[in-house]
């Protein structure tokens, strides 16, 4: 198994090559989009945008693929860097495949992207899609339940809980027996409302996993929450405004639960308002209240008493026009990286006052304002181009529900995949993680895991060679076959599985039906049927069978010939063997007609009117079987023969023998007649 450096070879249906190519999230965080190609199937994993870019620049490198060739598209969760380009891809490209996500993801996807459209600080011409495109894309998205197994065009897949955010899923994908697990963003730590990512029950051959935090180790949840609430309390008690930039859905709900509980425990803070500032605030919370059953046991137990998402100390704020900035307060505003929208407006309004503070509570992508302020520059540039001093405090506490090094390593150890492909991580963090994992598993003799960290548009090529086996079914399976014996049937391939069936069983086990093609050939012929029999018998002794009742010949057991009005009509069922026999018969007849075989004398001798043949035949029969074996007088072409009380008849026109009483007698008569016939022909 190797890692390719180029893309010269592309996997097809019969190839053993599995190709994994990041079109986004390759040594970067943002615009997650991973392409899988194996056994002729093409699958896209996520279709996001880059938060630090805008317009077409924010898209994955989808110009390197043909959208109409993609069979399946899986969306892991509703964050913009994983689904932000989906409406554009579904509505503005030639994609004709099927798109899957969980129910909660689909419900939140609509509102998240609606908010993104409204707050995007770019011109209409640069917008990737409109509200109408977003609405239309909903009809093209199918939903899947957790642990529900699906089979589409031979690709089997199942969704598993990923933690991270509500509805986030890992996808286990199986193609031709090879299993690939795509984690998306996941967290192995349970928080206040979400379950931890589960470990799928089967081992994948390939694990495609995020590497956002590289080798970092997260602080304990309790310590993180205490540090967060202490910072918020410090800012508001000194008379400042506390800004917490978040995305409308995801970590926002976790932080709201923490703040509401902390305010309840501290009566001295009750006069200080907390605002959840998002145009989608009410809609978002309605979605969370709907999908309570997708959350952890703590929330499900609490809902029996009261809904934890009906907050006592938090108010919704639709926009800055509805906000009276008259004193200390806490505002959670979107978007999380402050590229535009309400969080950007509030930051620019408050950044000059040292009493105020901003708490960055999630991962920040390079090129965003949130990432820039973490380095605490002396001044910032507003959206209008104005320079403002940065006097407010800046703190970073990671509530981002991504795995740290310990969680990632433990997850790999539990699954024991053969290959691990790292995506969704900055180049340096990803490289450090790869080296750390290699060192850890090199020392473990019980595992042999290979690690990869491809850049965007660079493919990882893996080869999986397996034996192809066919399952014998139907009437073929009912036969008692010995070891080493040969079986003949129709090999049926379906969903990368092979079955061997008798042709008659096709309709029972498949959607196919069997058809028979009968070939018919007409050839000019100037002689009789008996002459034709004599001619064809020269191809091979015993290859000609006379069907007296139908006045036709059967050659090689598969080709039937009749002579009608100086035309030979030849019929056979088309198979590769029968066609060869038919060619031989046709060549023999054509050679005779063209003068290559002299049978004119034979034609005269075999006519029923020829008295010499009759006389010779009667004399021969009497010498062989006795004088009384044939009557002294008879009429027509049928000569009756009686031997030891058993009756037979010889057709003097076709030379066919009929004897129902004794097959041995029939064969003896046939030999006598044929030898006499050949002797008379040879004498001419």
Curated annotation (Swiss-Prot):
CDD domains: CPSF3-like_MBL-fold. Zn(2+) 2 binds at residues 81-82, 185, 424. GO terms for cellular component: mRNA cleavage and polyadenylation specificity factor complex. Keywords: Endonuclease, Hydrolase, Metal-binding, mRNA processing, Nuclease, Nucleus, RNA-binding, Zinc. Pfam families: Beta-Casp, CPSF73-100_C, Lactamase_B_6, RMMBL. Binds 2 Zn(2+) ions per subunit. Its EC number is 3.1.27.-. One of its GO terms (molecular function) is metal ion binding. The keyword Transmembrane does not apply. GO terms for biological process: co-transcriptional mRNA 3'-end processing, cleavage and polyadenylation pathway; mRNA 3'-end processing by stem-loop binding and cleavage. It is an enzyme of class 3 (hydrolase). Zn(2+) 1 binds at residues 77, 79, 164, 185. Its cofactor is Zn(2+). The active site is at 402 (proton donor). Component of the cleavage and polyadenylation specificity factor (CPSF) complex that plays a key role in pre-mRNA 3'-end formation, recognizing the AAUAAA signal sequence and interacting with poly(A) polymerase and other factors to bring about cleavage and poly(A) addition. Has endonuclease activity and functions as an mRNA 3'-end-processing endonuclease. Required for the cotranscriptional processing of 3'-ends of polyadenylated and histone pre-mRNA. Component of the cleavage and polyadenylation specificity factor (CPSF) complex, composed of at least Clp, Cpsf73, Cpsf100 and Cpsf160. Interacts with Sym and Cpsf100 forming a core cleavage factor required for both polyadenylated and histone mRNA processing. Interacts with Slbp and Lsm11. Belongs to the metallo-beta-lactamase superfamily. RNA-metabolizing metallo-beta-lactamase-like family. CPSF3 subfamily. This is Cleavage and polyadenylation specificity factor 73. It comes from Drosophila melanogaster (Fruit fly).
């Amino acid at each position: 198994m190797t890692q390719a450096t180029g893309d010269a070879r592309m996997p097809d249906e019969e190839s053993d090559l599995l190709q994994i190519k990041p079109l986004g999230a390759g040594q970067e965080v943002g615009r997650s989009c991973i392409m899988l190609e194996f056994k002729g199937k093409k699958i896209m994993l996520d279709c996001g945008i880059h938060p630090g870019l805008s317009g077409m620049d924010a898209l994955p490198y989808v110009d390197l693929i043909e959208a109409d060739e993609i069979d399946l598209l899986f969306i892991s969760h509703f964050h913009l860097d994983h689904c932000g380009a989906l409406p554009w891809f579904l509505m503005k490209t030639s994609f004709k495949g099927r798109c899957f996500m969980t129910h909660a993801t689909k419900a939140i996807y609509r509102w998240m992207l609606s908010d993104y459209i409204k707050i995007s600080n770019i011109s209409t011409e640069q917008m990737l899609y409109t509200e109408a495109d977003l609405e239309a894309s909903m009809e093209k998205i199918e939903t899947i339940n957790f642990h529900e197994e699906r089979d589409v065009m031979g690709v089997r897949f199942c969704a598993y809980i990923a933690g991270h955010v509500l509805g986030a899923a890992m996808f286990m994908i199986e193609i031709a027996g090879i299993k690939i697990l795509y984690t998306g963003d996941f967290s192995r730590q349970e928080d206040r409302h979400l379950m931890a990512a589960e470990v799928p029950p089967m081992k994948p051959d390939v694990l495609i996993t995020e590497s956002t935090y590289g080798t970092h180790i997260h602080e304990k949840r309790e310590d993180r929450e205490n540090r967060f609430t202490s910072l918020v309390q410090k800012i508001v008690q000194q008379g400042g405004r506390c800004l917490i930039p978040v995305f409308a859905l995801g970590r926002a709900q976790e932080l709201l639960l923490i703040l509401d509980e902390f305010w309840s425990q501290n009566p001295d803070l009750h006069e200080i308002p907390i605002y959840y500032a998002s145009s989608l605030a009410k809609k978002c919370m309605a979605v969370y209240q709907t999908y309570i059953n997708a959350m952890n046991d703590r929330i499900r137990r609490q809902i029996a008493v009261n809904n934890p998402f009906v907050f006592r100390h938090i108010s919704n704020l639709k926009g800055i026009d509805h906000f009276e900035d008259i004193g200390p307060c806490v505002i959670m505003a979107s978007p999380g990286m402050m590229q535009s929208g309400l969080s950007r407006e509030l930051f620019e309004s408050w950044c000059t006052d040292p009493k105020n503070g901003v708490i960055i509570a999630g991962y920040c992508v390079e090129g965003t304002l949130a990432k820039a302020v973490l380095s605490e520059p002396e001044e910032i540039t507003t959206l209008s181009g104005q320079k403002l001093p940065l006097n407010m405090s800046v703190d970073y506490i990671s509530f981002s529900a991504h795995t740290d090094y310990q969680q990632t390593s433990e997850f790999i150890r539990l699954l024991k995949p053969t290959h691990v492909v790292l995506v969704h991580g900055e180049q340096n963090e990803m490289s450090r993680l790869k080296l750390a994992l290699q060192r850890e598993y090199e020392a473990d003799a019980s595992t042999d895991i290979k690690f990869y960290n491809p850049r965007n548009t660079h493919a990882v090529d893996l080869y999986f060679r397996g034996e192809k086996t066919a399952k014998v079914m139907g009437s073929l399976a009912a036969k008692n076959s010995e070891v080493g014996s040969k079986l003949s049937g129709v090999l049926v391939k379906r969903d990368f599985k092979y079955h061997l069936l008798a042709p008659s069983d096709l309709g029972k086990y498949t959607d196919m039906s069997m058809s028979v093609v009968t070939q018919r050939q007409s050839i000019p012929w100037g002689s009789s049927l008996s002459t034709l029999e004599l001619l064809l018998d020269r191809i091979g002794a015993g290859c000609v069978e006379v069907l007296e009742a139908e006045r036709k010949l059967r050659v090689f057991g598969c080709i039937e010939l009749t002579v009608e009005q100086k035309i030979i009509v030849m019929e056979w069922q088309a198979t590769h063997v029968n066609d060869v026999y038919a060619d031989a018969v046709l060549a023999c007849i054509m050679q005779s007609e063209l003068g290559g075989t002299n049978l004119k004398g034979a034609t005269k001798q075999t006519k029923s009117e020829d008295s010499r043949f009759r006389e010779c035949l009667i004399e021969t029969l009497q010498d062989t079987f006795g004088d009384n074996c044939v009557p002294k007088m008879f009429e027509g072409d049928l000569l009756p023969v009686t031997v030891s009380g058993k009756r037979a008849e010889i057709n003097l026109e076709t030379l066919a023998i009929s004897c129902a009483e004794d097959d041995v007698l029939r064969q003896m008569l046939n030999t006598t007649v044929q030898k006499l016939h050949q002797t008379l022909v040879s004498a001419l």
